[in-house]
Amino acid sequence: MEAPICLVENWKNQLTVNLEAIRILEQIAQPLVVVAIVGLYRTGKSYLMNRLAGRNHGFSLGSTVQSETKGIWMWCVPHPTKPTHTLVLLDTEGLGDVEKGDPKNDSWIFALAVLLSSTFVYNSMSTINQQALEQLHFVTELTQLIRAKSSPREDKVKDSSEFVGFFPDFIWAVRDFALELKLNGRPITEDEYLENALKLIQGDNLKVQQSNMTRECIRYFFPVRKCFVFDRPTSDKRLLLQIENVPENQLERNFQVESEKFCSYIFTNGKTKTLRGGVIVTGNRLGTLVQTYVNAINSGTVPCLENAVTTLAQRENSIAVQKAADHYSEQMAQRMRLPTDTLQELLTVHAACEKEAIAVFMEHSFKDDEQEFQKKLVVTIEERKEEFIRQNEAASIRHCQAELERLSESLRKSISCGAFSVPGGHSLYLEARKKIELGYQQVLRKGVKAKEVLKSFLQSQAIMEDSILQSDKALTDGERAIAAERTKKEVAEKELELLRQRQKEQEQVMEAQERSFRENIAKLQEKMESEKEMLLREQEKMLEHKLKVQEELLIEGFREKSDMLKNEISHLREEMERTRRKPSLFGQILDTIGNAFIMILPGAGKLFGVGLKFLGSLSS
């Protein structure tokens, strides 16, 4: 993108998603690092974001007391250090703009920035003091503006206890900072400055409680915190009015150094935007999230992460089924030369392509808890396999009929000119027909319908052969009877040979179905184990953070608040234990994937038994 575009418009107190911005996001298949900046209006947020983009111009700065940015603006740029990622910068409307009609929109802008970003930058002026913390009261409203789960928890634990599992990293950017970084006479880092400012203070009055609430929320919701303090870019007020046009060498050296540190930190440490369960957010996924959240706000409900992920999963999993099925069809078409000599040749290619297709689906799908979409894939691939089998059979029939047409041309001419209407004509006819059969045997790649087409050809000749046999004056009645019996025997042998081929092909189809069933179950088991490990890692991180906060509160002298976390920590430990001991879901898998096979595949009762045996071997 050459310039930013409005992502969420804020017009007359109504939030609207800009569909042009969504179309841009839909073109980005890479994972995203999403950096959002929030803060009071006219505090230099846009200028800082332009520096992240490596440009002087981009997000509009303005030079008056009026807020320039309205809604949320987006700028997608190549990530400077991660070529496989796209950096998405979100510049938000300034908080506290006196020209706004409804201050509630400030809260929604703040909440959207938290929900959409992987790194959340709060921008303020001068120092982190009581006033700065009061201005950040929006963080205390997040419990009313965001929900993690779609329904209340049965264990009565607050929904906000889940926030730590999906909230972004938090950066506090302090602009025009003129103080010395010292505490009790010793130098401290910016991070230590922030953590000291976030320590709770003793006191029971309302003002202290409110500022402590802000401190608690920041510490509790945002496990990863960082602070940067910036000098004023220039002491020349005239240059400040047109700061975007000021060359780098005219900026204060300290500002340059701190800006470089800030950008370098985000480029190096800014994490990929992910959802619960390790779902990586790409451009099109971010677009879906934006629309889902804004629709929820406009409908009067609270944006819910679980609902958003479910909406996203429905859309993405449908696409994953299509992508996997298309991969199957494309690879089958590329690797097969019709007609194949045998059905097994086709089924071998099918097995390889199906395995790849399942892998494609697993890679692009998530939260398919009931295996609804994997079941659709099973059905779709089976339908497409059957279509390839039909195409293969049709190609074999066309090829064989064409070859028999060519080989039997002389026979037809001989019949037309009466060459077999002579004594000994039946013997001559049999020789001519045998020559056709021998020539047919030499034809390459006749395909799976070779015997069937030959049988049809011979059947079409039966009346003519009998006519020639009956009119052959060189034969006695006994010899005619023997010849007729021999012909019947040959027909029966060919019928038996064809039946054996069909039985063999049916066995091959059953083997292919069993292999397909095993492949689906194995891949699903692998994915479920991976998701279980991911969930445990997330829970372990949450537990580690809650224990850290609990210990800090105890050290700071807030035992009551520390004790209040015990219930959450206890419930989280119970959840982790349930996750570890989660019973096998193979029965559920069999109900879904197995039923898909039972509905669409011949001989599925046998296959179902194979599935039970296979699942037993996996779960033992």
Swiss-Prot record:
Catalytic reactions on record: GTP + H2O = GDP + phosphate + H(+)
Keyword field contains GTP-binding: yes
Domain of life: Eukaryota
One Pfam family matching this protein: GBP
Tissues/organs with expression: Brain, lung, heart, spleen, kidney, liver and intestine.
Keywords: Coiled coil, Cytoplasm, Golgi apparatus, GTP-binding, Hydrolase, Immunity, Innate immunity, Membrane, Nucleotide-binding
Subcellular location field: Cytoplasm; Cytoplasm, Perinuclear region; Golgi apparatus membrane
Principal location: cytoplasm
Induction details: By IFNG/IFN-gamma, IFNB1/IFN-beta and TNF-alpha. Up-regulated upon infection by T.gondii or L.monocytogenes.
Coiled-coil regions listed: 375-411, 477-582
Enzyme Commission designation: 3.6.5.-
Major enzyme class: hydrolase
InterPro entries xref list: G_GB1_RHD3_dom (IPR030386), GBP_C (IPR037684), Guanylate-bd/ATL_C (IPR003191), Guanylate-bd_C_sf (IPR036543), Guanylate-bd_N (IPR015894), P-loop_NTPase (IPR027417)
Keyword Hydrolase: yes
One GO CC annotation: cytoplasmic vesicle
PANTHER family: GUANYLATE BINDING PROTEIN (PTHR10751)
Family stated for the protein in its record: Belongs to the TRAFAC class dynamin-like GTPase superfamily. GB1/RHD3 GTPase family. GB1 subfamily.
Record note on quaternary structure: Heterodimer with other family members, including GBP1, GBP2 and GBP5. Dimerization regulates subcellular location.
Its job: Interferon (IFN)-inducible GTPase that plays important roles in innate immunity against a diverse range of bacterial, viral and protozoan pathogens. Hydrolyzes GTP very efficiently; GDP rather than GMP is the major reaction product. Following infection, recruited to the pathogen-containing vacuoles or vacuole-escaped bacteria and acts as a positive regulator of inflammasome assembly by promoting the release of inflammasome ligands from bacteria. Acts by promoting lysis of pathogen-containing vacuoles, releasing pathogens into the cytosol.
Protein name: Guanylate-binding protein 3
Taxonomic lineage: Eukaryota, Metazoa, Chordata, Craniata, Vertebrata
Gene name of the record: Gbp3
